[in-house]
């Protein structure tokens, strides 16, 4: 399972990107199926990642916002004592939640994560306590690509231990190295490899100019020299995606070399819509928004012999489906004592069934959105309206006044969902307020 960070819907050649170079992701699309209508549960990092590992809405699993120090984003430097008790150091995914690798262990899967964890930094929240056997990466929301620091705080970990042994190595190269090692060492047994790259997320650096230092210089030179700051941001963004693409290609090649491609599911998607430097066209909005540009993301799935090659799936699917789908592929059933919000989407990907996903809901603080069929209602600080996604994917034409009965229906479904989340036990944001 490969996850990019803040990559836009149009930031792959196979999704229509004309200038970005992603030959290996395009190859993955040719050898597998491209999903055109795939959404995540939250328009930013942490809750989205929590959902894909639990199969549950953020409002059900309790991770419904970021574990983050907002003051750092305004240039405030915390000393080590203040940082130690800050939100991003003490928050984490509720330990009562059952994560995907914990269930896969029942079938003796070897589980490794190399990259961005983002679900808590205390020992009880870290990957080794949540079902993973190996972890090399960082546990907070973002770091500098070379120093591996978050606002001057060392953040890279090997296992539970903070380390500076690889300082100076570009993050994507580091995560590729560890993922390759993991595959080679575990090729003879069942494995779950999770590679959540931090590319192309902005760097978390106190120097605002270095926030846009996303890619090695040699990768940037593959694109025309930028003539403006805005264009420079775009080139850095594209170059970081291209480097990530090559790392993905190395993993795909290795699966081929080891004779494992036929028996390995490969899933790629972005954790949310693209932010600065991204191309979300033709969608409205971006990272942080509940419009499609914040929640609809590129997704590719390959399983030779099971999932059609070169196909496009237009069925509505979400990241909530990943947990039950991978368990099903491993011959496992979800724990009976937890409520899942997703379903096994393998029959849909195989072309044998229609999606049972008929509705989807989002809430990010005061922003709300609901989708029932192709009807999408948005009520946010960045805009409101009722949209028919079947003919208005860009959410430009508000039909609230023309379709009051539809608006009432969709808002009613959102109210019912919110009531269900409020009653979710033992977690959920509405229990905390």
Listing of model-derived features with the role each one plays in the protein:
Residues 1-384, 389-419, 424-433:
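Formylglycine-dependent sulfatase
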